[in-house]
């Protein structure tokens, strides 16, 4: 299935049904009084997080999502039926924002999470509501309230514990296929990976973590060069970044220069992403002659001025992969809860204790509170 991580949709909630003006008419009862029913509630639009989805492709081609209107009220105290709600299933990790203003609406972080994104209109009142001791035959009614209409932007950020970072052809896809159940396309040319791949790494019966492989970065990615900049947002929810280095490039490129370029692009794109825990993974050491391996690794670490964890592996032969997997799991397991950091745009401001206004105040134009 094609991977789509961005889509624009229109959601339209249903209008409430109109109230009814009606009077009781029966034999020998000349003044039966009002019996007009209320209108039904319009259908609302909900978003639900589905763990079985990993793309927004369904919303790329079906942009308009409209709920039905509520039924009108009728005589004999018959209230209109409420319209059925619309439930849109989206991948876990979807961020919903206003397409016109960019204001955040909601984000789906937990499987099964259900969020209201467009509320259906309330039904109008029938004349039964306006009967008083002085007005025995009211002819007032109210129309149904309109439902909300919104133009929304959907943005998917995959939920993974570990993200793979590096230049094209650094061996990221080979590593994720070696340690997990993912089977991405692997070839001996750059930009083989065109969209993010997720893999679940099983450490034990109930011990696992999720790895995300994104397309490789090149210099200038923060300004739009290459493919990686489009998918860097998928690394923003990870707990750990693995910076993979090709220690045996097929041309005469300098691995240190490439590594510094990646770090620079990461810092330009998002300082918070740059500040995440990052480990150095030196790959393709099976190609390096055994007598040169230690010297080449030492030279790289010295010139790169790296002081963090370093792992020497060969994703192709799986040499050193088990040690890396165990270390990753220990790091991920140190986070006792599975809480996902929400997007900073959704941080709720602290309540002002000096605010004396009621938390739930009736709207001034609501006829029910006049």
UniProtKB/Swiss-Prot annotation:
Residues 160-333 form the OBG-type G domain. Residues 346-370 are annotated as: Disordered. One of its GO terms (biological process) is ribosome biogenesis. Its cofactor is Mg(2+). It comes from the Bacteria. Its main location: cytoplasm. GO terms for cellular component: cytoplasm. NCBIfam families: Obg_CgtA, PRK12296.1, PRK12297.1, PRK12299.1, small_GTP. HAMAP family: GTPase_Obg (MF_01454). This is GTPase Obg. It comes from Methylibium petroleiphilum (strain ATCC BAA-1232 / LMG 22953 / PM1).
